[in-house]
Curated annotation (Swiss-Prot):
It is an enzyme of class 2 (transferase). Disruption phenotype: Does not affect vegetative growth. Does not significantly changes in the chitin content in vegetative hyphae, nor in conidia. Its EC number is 2.4.1.16. It holds the Pfam family DEK_C. This is Chitin synthase 5. GO terms for cellular component: cell septum; myosin complex; plasma membrane. The chain crosses the membrane at residues 747-767, 783-803, 1055-1075, 1445-1465, 1478-1498, 1506-1526. InterPro entries: Chitin_synth (IPR004835), Cyt_B5-like_heme/steroid-bd (IPR001199), Cyt_B5-like_heme/steroid_sf (IPR036400), DEK_C (IPR014876), Myosin_head_motor_dom-like (IPR001609), Nucleotide-diphossugar_trans (IPR029044), P-loop_NTPase (IPR027417). Keywords: Cell membrane, Glycoprotein, Glycosyltransferase, Membrane, Transferase, Transmembrane, Transmembrane helix. Residues 1-26, 345-367, 1628-1657 are annotated as: Disordered. Residues 1729-1785 form the DEK-C domain. Glycans are attached at residues 164, 643, 657, 668, 695, 894, 1018, 1420, 1533. The gene is CHS5. GO terms for biological process: chitin biosynthetic process; fungal-type cell wall organization.
Length: 1787
């Protein structure tokens, strides 16, 4: 056996990436970057390589129960670590120890899966032994369904250098098992169980005789098991059944030799332990104690008296724990015997090493006798694992670190905090490490001594031949050896072995039960939980320490080094070694020559070993050949070798563990070059900035220095005159074009000129400074629109305020008696008299009256609101002259009207007090009437129906004459009272008879007839009648007929009321639509692919970062969302210190030295502005543990634009069109421009998602923050309603209290969503989906018909010629609203919805000027868009509430906002001044409007909005008057370009002057992706078929080629469009997280690297290094795959061998079936492949193996294709689906 290398604590430190050229890592690893990378590998079920000797994996019980390609379960492990450990052991003839450490109590065991991934064949008995041992050392706990209760368990493998296992053993560490937690002191909480073996015992399907002999009962009958009340395994486990597990255990025990009498002794001991546990209660009854001890003594062969009398309760407790641990040791010893027996059979040739699955292992005669030991040490104890790892990594006082320091290698201190934590960890785990000096150690020592004493006391008196004694005394005559014999000395193993670390992380603190409900096995994730584990173990410091300073995985004595590598040119002596190192291109950091040793990093060592492998065996130097691969064993595949060396199996498509559902599992590469050749093709622009402006040392992303130091430069000539502007008026030297004008446009122009003909154009040109005809025309159009708006507003004000007065004058100057009665206040004191209404509020309090009759307030108060006719009658002889009435004659008034005698004012001779002024007969006409005239208000009116009713029904003697009402009731009653005395009958009988016969009627005609006849026949009679009529007017007149209810007066009111009712109905509907009381349950996770588009213009860094962070943090599957940032030009916003694209790229963590080429595409612009250039960047962005792919497109403009202020800027609409057009061409598989081809390549081949998979487009603004669940809610809404084409959520303000201007917007934002949009959403026709937060469906769910990416929408939305006022307002101001209008126009039967539960926040304008500008755009675009909507045909709904009507209401409401404000001001004035009737209905409507809104706030518990509503109302004049007026008048306030000038419109033609070279569409080459990919050897070709069904696991568009690079930006081959330099390429950096710690500098060894022109890109995978961080080497031809399929003896697991980046993975979309498939057929084009019978057989075989209750059809299809080793498409896919249904139906 080869000698052991002592104190080899080498922990390798190569990063996840490929070999580093520098000696030190350039970037430190932080917790965030490490957290990001861990999340990536968790999603991909891959390991993460922390350094060359350390791997991290993430596992849960879910991942541990998933079957791998070999059909076994166990979770994620790193086979590469096992392979590295083996290669170091065999090549260096040194022992190794792989520590499987757990960082969390919930992590499952990975011992068995790790052993299965080992690069040598292990005997099957090893796995059977571990299977048998598991129930003894694991138990159920709430935090882990298989919680380990042992400190450490080791499997030691002794192998010869040929890779044959010569010996193997299993052993517990000396710390043993925690029997307290697993048996004696189970927590009395639900969810805990004892060791699983006891439940298996009770559930075992043993014979009845066996159960009777053991006396077994239910688990609840045993005190040891009944503490927690949990007896069954967790129900969430897919195979949770103690009975089945018991059968498996019995079979496993039988395999390792525990059968027959041994099995009976074994189960007897277990039963005895259960029974003995019933005696551990201090209060146990003595009889019960004796009975139990009698039973236990019989099972164990021990005298019951010893157990009952000589052992205390504590002794029995110690006995139970010690005996159980001794039983476990016995099981392990039996297992080791079985392993040795199998190995003996293998050596004898009777059995193969892998149980018959492979070739026979050569016997011992075939090896040279040297052996090495590899110990796989599982350390589930958190404290022990942490102590072992941190001491080995950070402690410089021992191990390899100490040896390096002594040899002169600079070893930086780990830092005081790290060393302190390391020391604390070692102290904490001291007893487990054998250190008994501390308090815990002394307690542990006391426990062990006590246990030995009790076991010896009981064991001595046991029967000599009993099993019990054999357990306690396995070696006769040596006493109790428990914890020593057969145990593993961890300190000794580590002291003689090279240590490797395989650390298991758990992704969440959630209970295991909660994981069962997750949608996928990799869904559980808590960044805080993982971060806590990383920090607790100091893994960032670990990575930085190892990778920066101590990345040495091999070390040699100087002589040994020379001897081994002399054949490669290494010469003797230190100088010879250093010279050879320099020749190899290794820096001092890669190979360090110490005082006595040479220390090598992993990459350098493998390069040297690779060169040795390439040498013929005969050339090997002495001492080296025996360490090389022996005959018949393939050498390791290092990636640097050409013949391989047996390290890794061939890594190809079939070996990568990725799928399109597993994004972020590979390191992304961006595809651009650092430099271009001197020449370039016309189709591609050179780098944007001239070389003289580019900061090559610091990097500027290839965007130049514009905006960083000098902004908005204006070019002037030597004379200081502005240059570059066109002649704005004349079209000289310009190309003249003629365009057809639509009929509607011609009619509008005619109307404009008809209204504005009187305004001369010279006046506009010279006074208004409008030199251009199109600008003047826009002003005229604006004038006409404002004039029309003014007329509408004036009409509204006139209609509401003045029309009613014109139709019904004096309607507010009359009152009924009841209305008069309402005025009884101290300041509102009204009375009526003789048909007149008086307001005596200023009179009644004034003392007045005669001597002795002074009127006071108390006396006057009762008369308020009353009629004073009976109280103040005129003298009858004065009121009725010419009728012969005596001066004392008076009528008797109605008694009911003169109840208060104090009010009687009898004037004239009838006054009883001659001294009173009333005694004057002229007091009434001369004093009373003139004074009352001062307080006259109007006429008293009577309802005609009331007059008629009382006259006809109550014999009320009153009539109507000429609309005057005369009441003769007192006249007739006085006559009746006076018996018709002649003196009281002073009225003409002809008149009174009419009244008597027609009371309550209109007698105008009758009386007029009497007057006419008298006038014709008898003038005396006529004179008498006239005197009668005069008397009527003076004495009997009581008012006029109420005219306010006539048709003339009511028509306008009814019109207003009708509109009021309609408005109220709309408001009520809006209110109802806002009352959505449904629960806000979070929808289930969605699996749709979504592009999150963020157009960036001049936003600041804070806004951009918040927007990107919010998208990254969305609670949506990270692999199914893509952030697409489109920077609209290279320009610097106000307050920024650099251009917006640079800010975006800085945030995303892109390397500033990256300079992708500028690629042409067609923009939305006039003439030559349609040609634009853009750059594409891609990578990963990390925030709070979420890692999301991104694509950034920067519009950089043509070369001629670089001197302008805004190169590349074409507007937000162009940014939207850029992506929409790309997705349109992806959908139709149409030819693409170079920029789109590069975008397709970045998304499809680098990010790994077929762009056709994306189903939704989420549009947000760069200053918008989206709530975490918003995207899920929007997608869920669309998933539940396939008719939804667009949907938006609620937008609120994030800066609501920043200024007064933001405060007045809060309420408006809330109510515009919860009333307006919620109401429109009822019709499925939200008229404005805001661009700041809207999601569109890309294609219909049923037939895949394109929606927002349809040709019609893109054609209308990308109108390049925006040269009229209407188009300007549509496409330049309100592009978001117009996009909604176009969607509604082209897809009228689709729905556009509002989801109030999807929430985002945006930044509102904080300054008045900004608010003014924003609202100008909004208001004007609203008007013009609603006009467009009014013209649509399919806008009708149900009843009158059609969508067209709602649109009309919105349009009209926007236009008449100023009138609304004026009317509200008028109302306030009217109410405040009391100059008119109280507007009750209007105020009720206003109260209803805002009351319902307030009710919404209250019901939604948004109390704060009540306050915001008050602030909004205070600012109402601003919103309804100032902003609209300003907006209307500034409709033509645009920047008018000089490229195309409309110089005139005549008839059907528009004359346009063009001042540039124009745009030739042929200047932008177009090519289909498949043709482009085929011509340039790119993967991801999709074939000619249309879109196919997208599956979760298997995709029909598997990669076909052996490379993933962009023709525009990858190094090889040069772009067919750019002809770029072939010597350089760049690696696109990821976000500041995952891989900043990996150097990107190329190395000088082993030929080209991924960062140079790598010729290995097309080589067989045998020659590709798993260490190379590249995607080039991942692929190989199918023929090469088949040639090397069996080249390596190392078995491969699914997934790569080198973790996240060390081994390449397929991008998302490469499924497991695709990885294992070696061919892909389209049976429509290729007749090869399986026939129908083979497919049916495969389906039946798969259905026999899967769980039909949980498996999905897609999974069955994937498994069938995997079994067939073929991907089925076309008709074969259809047949497969149909046959699966048939088989399921027949089962």
């Amino acid at each position: 056996m080869a000698s052991r290398r002592m104190s080899m604590y080498s922990v390798t430190s190569e990063g996840m990436g490929g070999p580093r050229g520098a000696g030190q890592q350039s970037t430190s690893v932080s917790t965030t970057t490490l957290l990001n990378a861990i999340h990536n590998i968790y999603l991909a079920s891959q390991p993460y390589r922390l350094d060359a000797g350390t791997s991290l994996v993430v596992n849960t019980w879910l991942t541990a129960t998933q079957a791998g390609p070999d059909g076994e379960v166990g979770g994620t492990v790193d086979p590469a670590l096992a392979a590295r450990a083996w290669e170091h052991a065999r090549r260096r003839a040194e022992d190794g120890c792989i520590i499987l450490g757990s960082l969390h109590q919930s992590t499952p065991s990975v011992m068995k899966p790790f052993l299965r991934s080992f690069p040598v064949s292990l005997p099957s008995s090893v796995f059977k032994a571990l299977e048998a041992l598991d129930p003894f050392i694991h138990c159920v706990a709430p935090f882990n369904p298989s919680a380990p209760r042992h400190a450490a368990l080791g499997v030691t493998l002794t192998m010869n250098l040929a890779g044959n296992v010569t010996a193997a053993s299993i052993a517990l560490s000396q710390a043993g098992i925690d029997t307290a937690a697993g048996l004696l002191s189970i927590p009395a909480e639900a969810g805990y169980r004892a060791f699983d073996v006891f439940y298996h015992l009770l559930s075992s399907a043993s014979t009845p005789a066996e159960r009777e002999f053991l006396g077994l009962k239910s688990a609840s009958s045993y005190a040891l098991l009944a503490r927690s009340g949990t007896y069954d395994p967790p129900s969430y486990l897919p195979t949770a059944d103690d009975g089945a597990s018991a059968d498996d255990l019995r079979a496993a025990l039988k395999e390792i030799g525990i059968k027959g009498s041994s099995h009976r002794d074994f189960i007897s001991t277990l039963a005895a332990l259960l029974k003995l546990g019933d005696t551990l209660d201090y209060t146990v009854d003595e009889e019960v104690l004796e009975e139990v001890c009698e039973d236990v003594g019989g099972l164990l062969g021990v005298d019951p008296e010893v157990l009952a009398k000589q052992c205390t309760t504590e002794d029995r407790q110690t006995l139970v724990g010690g005996l159980y641990e001794a039983l476990v040791d016995w099981v392990i010893s039996k297992a080791n015997q079985a392993i040795q027996a199998q190995l003996a059979r293998i050596r004898d040739g009777d059995e193969s090493s892998d149980g018959g699955r492979g070739a026979r292992t050569p016997n011992s005669a075939e090896d040279n006798g040297d052996t090495v030991c590899l110990t796989i040490l599982e350390v589930p104890d958190l404290a022990l694992a942490k102590a072992l790892a941190m001491r080995g990594i950070f402690d410089d006082s021992q191990g390899i670190n100490s040896e390096m320091k002594q040899d002169g290698v600079e070893v930086a201190s780990a830092g005081q905090s790290v060393l302190r934590e390391t020391q604390n960890a070692v102290v904490e785990a001291g007893p487990l490490l054998g250190d008994m000096s501390g308090p815990k150690g002394r307690d542990r020592q006391h426990h062990l001594e006590k246990r030995e004493e009790v076991l010896e006391k009981v064991g001595i008196v046991a029967d000599d031949d009993c099993f019990f004694k054999k357990l306690l005394f396995p070696v006769s005559g040596q006493g109790i050896q428990l914890g020593q014999a057969g145990r593993l000395d961890i300190q000794g193993v580590l002291g003689s072995s090279r240590a490797w670390y395989h650390l298991s992380i758990h992704p969440t603190d959630d209970s295991p039960a909660s994981l069962a409900a997750l949608p996928s096995i990799n869904s559980a994730w808590s960044a805080g939980t993982v971060s806590r584990q990383l920090r607790a173990w100091r893994l960032p410091e670990w990575a930085n320490r190892r990778n920066k300073n101590l990345d040495f995985t091999a070390d040699f004595d100087v002589e040994e080094f020379v001897q081994r590598y002399s054949i490669l040119g290494c010469r003797e002596g230190r100088d010879g070694i250093e010279t050879w190192i320099l020749e190899r291109g290794w820096s001092n950091g890669e190979v360090v020559v110490g005082h006595e040793r040479v220390w090598m990093r992993e990459s350098a060592w493998w390069e040297a070993e690779n060169m040795l492998d390439m040498k013929p065996m005969g050339d090997m130097p002495m001492g080296a050949s025996n360490l090389m691969a022996p005959p018949g064993v393939m050498a390791m595949d290092t990636g640097y070798s050409h013949n391989g060396s047996g390290y890794f199996p061939p890594i190809n498509d079939a070996a990568s563990n990725g799928s399109r559902d597993q994004l972020l599992h590979q390191r992304n590469q961006s595809q651009a070059t650092l430099a271009m050749g001197m020449g370039h093709s016309p189709g591609v622009a050179p780098s944007v900035a001239p070389s003289g402006l580019r900061n090559v040392s610091k990097g500027d992303y290839g965007l130049g220095g514009k905006g960083d130091n000098h902004r908005d430069e204006i070019l002037f000539n030597n004379e200081g005159e502005f240059v570059g502007a066109l002649d704005p008026e004349l079209a000289n030297n310009k190309k003249i074009e003629e365009q057809q004008t639509s009929k509607s446009r011609r009619m509008w122009v005619a109307l404009v000129w008809a209204i504005t003909f009187w305004i001369p154009s010279p006046l506009l040109r010279y006074v208004g400074r409008m030199k251009r005809p199109d600008v003047r025309m826009a002003w005229r159009e604006k004038f006409v629109l404002c004039f029309i708006i003014f007329l509408l507003n004036a009409a509204i004000v006139f209609w509401i305020i003045f029309l009613g007065r014109l139709l019904c004058p004096n309607f507010d100057k009359v009152w009924t008696r009841d209305e008069v009665k309402q005025h009884q206040g101290d300041t509102d004191f009204w009375v009526s008299n003789r048909g007149k209404v008086y307001d005596i509020s200023k009179f009644w309090k004034i003392p007045h009256g005669d001597v002795g009759n002074e009127a006071t307030q108390d006396l006057m108060q009762p008369f308020a609101g009353l009629s004073m006719d009976a109280y103040i009658p005129p003298p009858l002889f004065k009121a009725c002259p010419g009728l012969g009435i005596g001066d004392r004659l008076a009528l008797v008034p109605n008694a009911t009207e003169t109840e208060n005698s104090a009010g009687m004012h009898i004037s004239g001779p009838g006054q009883a007090n001659p001294t009173s002024g009333l005694a004057d007969a002229n007091w009434y006409p001369d004093v009373f009437l003139p004074r009352m005239k001062e307080y006259y208000k109007g006429e008293l009116v009577w309802d005609a129906s009331k007059i008629n009713s009382e006259g006809q029904n109550q014999d009320h003697k009153w009539v109507i004459y000429d609309n005057k009402v005369y009441d003769l009731r007192d006249y007739f009653s006085t006559l009746k009272t006076m018996n018709n005395l002649a003196q009281y009958k002073f009225l003409d009988d002809s008149l009174t008879q009419v009244v008597e016969r027609n009371p309550g009627t209109d007698v105008t005609g009758t009386w007029n007839g009497l007057l006419s006849n008298a006038q014709r026949n008898n003038l005396t009679t006529y004179t008498t009648l006239r005197n009668n009529m005069n008397c009527m007017d003076n004495y009997f007149y009581v008012g006029t007929v109420d005219f306010r209810y006539t048709a003339r007066c009511q028509t306008n009111n009814y019109f207003l009321l009708a509109f009021a009712i309609i408005m109220c109905a709309v408001i009520l509907l809006k209110f109802v639509s806002a009352l959505q009381f449904g629960s806000k349950r979070r929808p289930s996770p969605q699996d749709k692919f979504v592009i999150c588009q963020v157009p960036a213009y001049t936003e600041g860094e804070d806004s951009l970062r918040k927007a990107l962070d919010s998208l990254t943090a969305l609670q949506y599957d990270n692999k199914r969302k893509l952030i697409c940032v489109i920077c609209d030009g290279v320009l610097t916003g106000e307050g920024n210190d650099r251009p917006t694209p640079k800010i975006v790229l800085d945030i995303l963590g892109v390397d500033p030295k990256v300079d992708p080429p500028a690629l042409p595409f067609k923009s939305v612009g006039a003439s030559s502005e349609q040609l634009n250039y853009g750059k594409v960047y891609s990578g990963l962005y990390e925030f709070e543990g979420n890692v999301v792919p991104y694509v950034v497109v920067v519009k950089v403009g043509k070369e001629s634009e670089q001197s302008k202020a805004k190169p590349g800027n074409r507007g937000k609409r162009d940014s939207q069109i850029l992506l929409m057009s790309f997705l349109n061409r992806v959908h139709h598989r149409a030819p693409m421009n170079p920029l789109e081809l590069e975008m397709f390549h970045q998304i499809n081949n680098i990010i790994g998602v077929d762009p056709e998979l994306y189903e939704y487009l989420l549009m947000i603004d760069a200053d918008t923050c989206v709530r975490e669940d918003a995207l899920t809610r929007l997608v869920a809404s669309c998933a539940s309603d396939a008719k939804i084409a667009g949907i938006c959520g609620e937008t609120s303000l994030q800066n609501e209290e920043r200024s007064w201007w933001t405060m007045i917007q809060v309420y408006e934002y809330f109510i515009s969503h919860h009333l307006a949009k919620a109401f429109e959403s009822l019709f499925g026709s939200v008229t404005c989906l805001p661009g700041c937060f809207t999601m569109y469906r890309l294609r219909t769910a049923d037939k895949g018909k394109p929606l927002i990416i349809s040709d019609n929408v893109i054609r209308d939305y990308s109108d390049c010629y925006v040269d009229t006022l209407h188009k300007k307002n549509l496409l330049s101001l309100g592009e978001d609203r117009y996009l909604t209008t176009l969607m509604t126009k082209h897809f009228p039967y689709m729905s556009f919805k509002f989801n109030p539960n999807a929430f985002c926040q945006t930044a509102a304008p904080e300054k008045w000027s900004v608010l003014l500008s924003q609202r100008r755009r909004w208001i004007n675009s609203t008007i013009h868009n609603l006009v467009e909507l009014m013209t649509l045909k399919e806008m009708c709904g149900f009843c009158c509430f059609s969508m067209r009507f709602v649109v009309f209401v919105d349009l009209f409401g926007t236009i008449i906002l100023p009138a609304t404000c004026v009317y509200l001001g008028y109302l306030i004035y009217t109410v405040a001044s009391g100059t008119g009737p109280f507007p009750l209905i209007t105020l009720i409507m206003l109260a209803a409007v805002y009351g319902l809104q307030a009710l919404i706030f209250i019901l939604k518990r948004q109390w704060q909005h009540i306050g915001w509503m008050i602030i909004y109302l205070l600012a109402f004049p601003i919103y309804s008057f100032i902003l609209p007026i300003y907006s209307f008048w500034n409709q033509d306030n645009f920047s008018w370009g000089n490229t195309r000038i409309v110089v005139g419109e005549s008839g059907k033609k528009t004359i346009v002057a063009v001042d540039d070279e124009g745009f030739d569409p042929r200047s932008i080459p177009l090519q289909r992706w498949d043709d482009y990919a085929l011509a340039n050897n790119l993967p991801g070709r999709r074939g000619g078929a249309g879109p196919t069904e997208k599956m979760d696991h298997v995709f029909a568009d598997a990669y076909e080629m052996d490379d993933m690079r962009s023709v525009y930006s990858a190094a090889r081959p040069g772009s067919v469009l750019t002809g770029m330099n072939r010597n350089t390429a760049y690696m696109s950096p990821n976000s500041p997280a995952p891989y900043q710690h990996m150097s990107r500098s190329p190395t000088a060894y082993a030929g080209p690297t991924p960062y140079s022109d790598n010729p290995a890109a097309r080589q067989s995978m045998v020659s590709m290094s798993p260490y190379q961080d590249t995607n080039h080497g991942r692929m190989m031809s199918m023929s090469n795959l088949r040639n090397v399929a069996n080249a390596s003896p190392v078995p491969t697991r699914a997934g790569t061998a080198m973790g996240f980046a060390g081994g390449s993975r397929a991008p998302l979309g490469q499924s497991e079936a695709a990885r294992q498939s070696t061919m892909s057929f389209d049976f429509q084009r290729n007749a090869a492949g399986p026939d129908d019978f083979q497919i049916v057989d495969a389906i039946r075989a798969v259905l026999m193996e899967v769980d039909l209750d949980t498996v999905t059809k897609k999974q069955v299809r994937a498994l069938v294709e995997q079994r067939l080793q073929t991907e089925l498409v076309g008709e074969r896919r259809t047949f497969l689906d149909r046959q699966i249904d048939n088989e399921l139906a027949n089962m």
